[in-house]
Amino acid sequence: MQVAYHWQVISRLLIALLRFYKLFISPLLGPRCRFAPSCSEYAMTAIGRFGPLRGSWLAARRLGRCHPFHPGGFDPVPDAPASPSSSCSCKGPHP
């Protein structure tokens, strides 16, 4: 239980840093992101949905695609994988 709490604290800290960037730094730089949602919104959603490790990895991959040679466009955060019991059509119990 304690480990999960630490990951939650790290997620909240990362999201707070992203909000700070979005409120105070991003307006100084002007609109630059070629994606929708913006890279900072994408990162906040990914960290909130997948936690700090996988969410940060997804955000880093997104930043790697954010360059002048990529067309950009709509690029949402992937959905969290469904639990095995909700995607399985069998009638038996799952371990």
Swiss-Prot record:
- Major site of localization recorded for this protein: membrane
Keyword tags: Cell inner membrane, Cell membrane, Membrane
What are its GO cellular component terms? plasma membrane
Bilayer disposition of the protein: Peripheral membrane protein
Keyword Cell membrane recorded: yes
Q: Which domain of life is it from?
A: Bacteria
Q: Where in the cell is it found?
A: Cell inner membrane
Q: Which InterPro entries match?
A: Membr_insert_effic_factor_YidD
NCBIfam families (alphabetical): membrane protein insertion efficiency factor YidD
PANTHER family in UniProt:
MEMBRANE PROTEIN INSERTION EFFICIENCY FACTOR-RELATED
Q: Provide the family line.
A: Belongs to the UPF0161 family.
Q: What does this protein do?
A: Could be involved in insertion of integral membrane proteins into the membrane.
> Would you tell me the protein name for this molecule?
Putative membrane protein insertion efficiency factor
